[in-house]
């Protein structure tokens, strides 16, 4: 739970608090849209016309409609500026920070 949660929680909390519309892409390619109503260790509750419980293991990407400030006193360590938060990167496929893990 350590490092992964320290990035996820502040990011998802900021999206929830500020009611930022998000697009959530699932691993099977389906795109869901709405606002994050709530979340826990395993699921995100996404609200649009209905509420949907989306399991985190099925999520590929969460893309906010606008940038959000999600830093909570550097809880995630490191610089924090390399964290991808959907800043309208059209066509730019910037490598992940840990590029040796992606292929």
From Swiss-Prot:
One of its GO terms (cellular component) is cytosol. Residues 9-68 form the Sm domain. One of its GO terms (molecular function) is RNA binding. SUPFAM superfamilies: Sm-like ribonucleoproteins (SSF50182). InterPro entries: Hfq (IPR005001), LSM_dom_sf (IPR010920), Sm (IPR047575). Residues 63-103 are annotated as: Disordered. Residues 81-96 have a biased composition (Polar residues). GO terms for biological process: regulation of DNA-templated transcription; regulation of RNA stability; regulation of translation, ncRNA-mediated. Keywords: RNA-binding, Stress response. Homohexamer. RNA chaperone that binds small regulatory RNA (sRNAs) and mRNAs to facilitate mRNA translational regulation in response to envelope stress, environmental stress and changes in metabolite concentrations. Also binds with high specificity to tRNAs. Belongs to the Hfq family. This is RNA-binding protein Hfq. The gene is hfq.
């Amino acid at each position: 739970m350590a490092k992964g949660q320290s990035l996820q929680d502040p990011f998802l909390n900021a999206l929830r608090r500020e009611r930022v519309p998000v697009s959530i892409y699932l691993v099977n390619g389906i795109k869901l849209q709405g606002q994050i109503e709530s979340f826990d260790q395993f699921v995100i509750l996404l609200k649009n016309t209905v509420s949907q419980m989306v399991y985190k293991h099925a999520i590929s990407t969460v893309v906010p409609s606008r940038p959000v400030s999600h830093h909570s006193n550097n809880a995630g360590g490191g610089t924090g500026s390399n964290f991808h938060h959907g800043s309208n990167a059209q066509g730019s496929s910037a490598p992940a920070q840990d590029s040796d893990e992606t292929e």
